[in-house]
Structure formats: structure tokens, C-alpha cells
Amino acid sequence: MKFEDYQRFTFRRDGRILVCSFSGNAVNAVDARMHDELAELFVDLQHDEDSDLIVLTGENRAFCAGGDFDWFDEQINDPRKFRAIAYDAKRIVSGLLDLEKPIIARLNGAAAGLGATIALLCDVIIADEAAKIGDPHVKVGLVAGDGGAIIWPQLIGFARAKELLMTGDLLSATEAARMGLINYAVPTDQLDAKVAEIAGKILGNPRWAVRWTKMTANITLKQIMVSTSDAAVAYETLSNMTADRKEAVAAFRERRPMNLTGE
């Protein structure tokens, strides 16, 4: 795997474990470069011959806090830039679901928007109990078309998922674990030990039994993705062109209530 090709991720090996870390700004917000790299990342991880398990985590104070607001402004001012990422948005989700190697999400901090989607598409999610997780697409005027509307209902049911997706509320890691959205929420000083424990248990089993069990479990998710992702991305693309989308981003930047018109 050519680590040097990546600017928004860092990599570290621990035996047969490859630790892959978001490494952007202070909250690892997704910009154009990171989005491009995400579309390639999981394919490259699949072909890395020196790893059997991936740990995905974040540097700085967040796991991945969703979209970068400067990038949002670019997409609002030139909707062609949003349309241009539609194909890669689907590749990110399919890349995760097609990755045969088990992948553990180590939530060291906030996972929001696309960051939450990526975490929830991982096989095991272990969070610092101080972390927050949620999908606030609606709070910035967007449909959760990047996979959020696909994976949340599968994990916690449609009623809870739609409430959280339509309010954009964030959950504490403890609450997320309680409702089954993630696997574990642990104290900060126990996070690495818990990740190592689960990784060790997985790696203690025959490689191909583990990989193909994961692939079998992912069949239904892949069928759902194929049947819904085109519409989900199309709805998100349309929402980027609304007046309320522009207002929502401006209000967030200016730390004021939104003045929504329904347009």
C-alpha cells in the first residue's frame, strides 16, 4: 500500500493490525481532498498484504466531524462541484462494505455526518465515553444521502433512526451503546485496551473464516445500498441547491438561528 499517496490519513502498523487515522484539521472535517482519498482508501486497505485487521481512528480531538464548511461554501456557490462527488460518495460506502478485512472504528472523539456513517459501516465500533455521534446533515440543509439514511435504520430501527436523522441530534457514546448503535463506550483510559482486546479475539480466529463471515453478514447491507444509494445521493444533490441550504450554512457560521423560507 502506498501510504505516501495520502495527505489526509496517517498509517501505523502493529503486527498484522494497520491503524489508519483521519489526519485533517483540528476536527478532521471532510474536504475535497479527504473525500477523494476516502473513495480510494478502503480498496487500498483491501489490497494491503501486510494487514489482517484495520483500526480506523482520528488524530487530534475528533474521529471525523463531518463536512468542512469552506467546502460547503464551494459546493453552494458552484453546484457542479457537489454533483462531481456523487460517484465517489457511493464508492466510499461500497468500499467499506466490500472490504473483507475486519475493521474496528476507534472513536476517540466526535463522529458526525459522513464521519458517523463511516464509523457505523465499520464492523465493531468502540468509543471513548466522552465522544459524541450523530448525523446533523439536516442542520446544514442536506439530506443524509452519503449512507446515513441507509445504515442508521439497520442498526437501531426506523423509528429511532428517522427521529435522529430528522432532528440532527447528537448522542453521547454511552447512549449510543445503550441503544445498540455502537458496540462499546468506555472511559478514555480504557479505549486502547478495549480495542486491543476485541482485535486480539478476532485475529485469534482463522483469517478466511473471519473475512467470509463478515462478507456474508454484509450481503443484506450491500443489497440495501445498491437499491437506495442512487436515490439517496440524488436527493442530497438536490438539497444542496436549495435556498435553505445556503441559509443553514450561513447561520451556523454566524452562530445565529436559521431564517428558513422553505425554498
Q: Which positions does each model-derived feature cover?
A:
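Glycine- (often His-adjacent) and acidic-residue-rich active-site loop
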Residues: 3, 58-95, 111, 141, ...
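Terminal low-complexity tails and localization/encapsulation signals of metabolic enzymes
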Residues: 1-6, 250-263
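Conserved CoA-thioester-binding segment of acyl-CoA-metabolizing enzymes
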Residues: 1-59, 94
